[in-house]
Amino acid sequence: MSLDRFLKNAISPWMKKDGSDADIVLSSRIRLARNMSAFTFPMLSSKEEAYAVAKHVKDALGGTQGEALGKAEMLAMEDMRTNDKRMLVEKHLISPHLAEQSKYGMVLLSGDESLSIMINEEDHIRIQSLSAGFELENCLQAANAVDDWVESHLTYAYDSQYGYLTSCPTNVGTGMRASVMIHLPALAMTRQLQRILPAINQLGLVVRGIYGEGSEALGNLFQISNQITLGKTEQDIVDDLQGVVKQLIRQERVARDSLLQHSKLELKDRVFRSYGILANSYIIDSKEATRRLSDVRLGIDLGFIENTAGKILDELMILTQPGFLQQYAKTVLTPEQRDERRAALIRERLKLEHETAD
């Protein structure tokens, strides 16, 4: 196994599985932040200290891997090209911080890409568990298994009063971030998001774009996560998030039913216009592509568009990002060239899907 194995396909093996409410919740994630008591935390460490952390973790974990993680591969950021790191970010396998700002950053990736351990990110160790659909409980179970395995080899920085100690005070306590990636096109079309999203923030949750903090919400895709980690158990955090997400799922389904009942013709027109643009465009920028893909995904979920799998929309969301476009072009592309390549890739992928269905 090598880096090429993780860059070969836009869709990770875990994304191909079916999860609960997958027509609305694209994925679930649990992330655990941990530090080692014997080393300076990454935000204050020197390059020499960061190197010592990387070596210590690699020596402790690299040759064992255990049942929790399965067959895995250790990848060093310094050995990777900039575009390779960008592609791993686009697949949500590593964070932008690890790719761009880490000192001697590394990642240990499981074979199916559902589990990863980032080293020398904002914290010494960040464990991530991913699952298709609304599967926070399964993600938590998998993340905890990896956490137990890591802790059996390393000594964590832990305080009996405050819990796990982290670089950012907002992560102190459980050190856990639970999140879902959710598609809310009907709530956006019916202009209910302007009311709903501020209410979610008031409940102690955070709404972001699909690449986390600082990213823009595109294509009616939102990442919703907990904000508070201190004073709550991991199960409390998951339960709180699940309660809000279940309400969002119900509201999105009601909004979809309302559109079908009162605006079916207009909705169909919007869906097929977007499909037509994607299938026939020769230039399309990232924002428009994401917006049109959102419309088409809704059309597939509502049964308007047949013989097209919803998973190819998830695939195209990743394939049309700059890193993957440049990988397939085998060269650095200008923004204008990316728009041309993006349109060509979408045209070809939709044509292939149609021919396969026939």
Curated annotation (Swiss-Prot):
Broad enzyme group: transferase
Q: Does the keyword Transferase apply?
A: yes
| Matching SUPFAM superfamilies | Glutamine synthetase/guanido kinase
**One CC-aspect GO term:** extracellular space
Q: Pfam families per the record?
A: ATP-gua_Ptrans
Molecular function (GO) terms for this protein are:
ATP binding; creatine kinase activity; protein kinase activity
Q: How is the activity of this chain controlled?
A: Appears to be allosterically activated by the binding of pArg-containing polypeptides to the pArg-binding pocket localized in the C-terminal domain of McsB.
Q: Which residues bind ATP?
A: 27-31, 92, 126, 177-181, 208-213
> Does the keyword field hold Kinase?
yes
Q: Which UniProt keywords apply?
A: Allosteric enzyme, ATP-binding, Kinase, Nucleotide-binding, Transferase
Q: Where is this motif: RDXXRA motif of the pArg binding pocket involved in allosteric regulation?
A: 338-343
Biological process (GO) annotations?
Answer: phosphocreatine biosynthetic process
What reaction is this protein's catalytic activity? L-arginyl-[protein] + ATP = N(omega)-phospho-L-arginyl-[protein] + ADP + H(+)
NCBIfam families noted in UniProt = PRK01059.1-4, PRK01059.1-5
Instruction: Give the protein's biological function.
Output: Catalyzes the specific phosphorylation of arginine residues in a large number of proteins. Is part of the bacterial stress response system. Protein arginine phosphorylation has a physiologically important role and is involved in the regulation of many critical cellular processes, such as protein homeostasis, motility, competence, and stringent and stress responses, by regulating gene expression and protein activity.
Q: Tell me which family the UniProt entry assigns to this protein.
A: Belongs to the ATP:guanido phosphotransferase family.
Annotated HAMAP family? Prot_Arg_kinase
* Name this protein carries in UniProt: Protein-arginine kinase
Q: Which gene encodes it?
A: mcsB
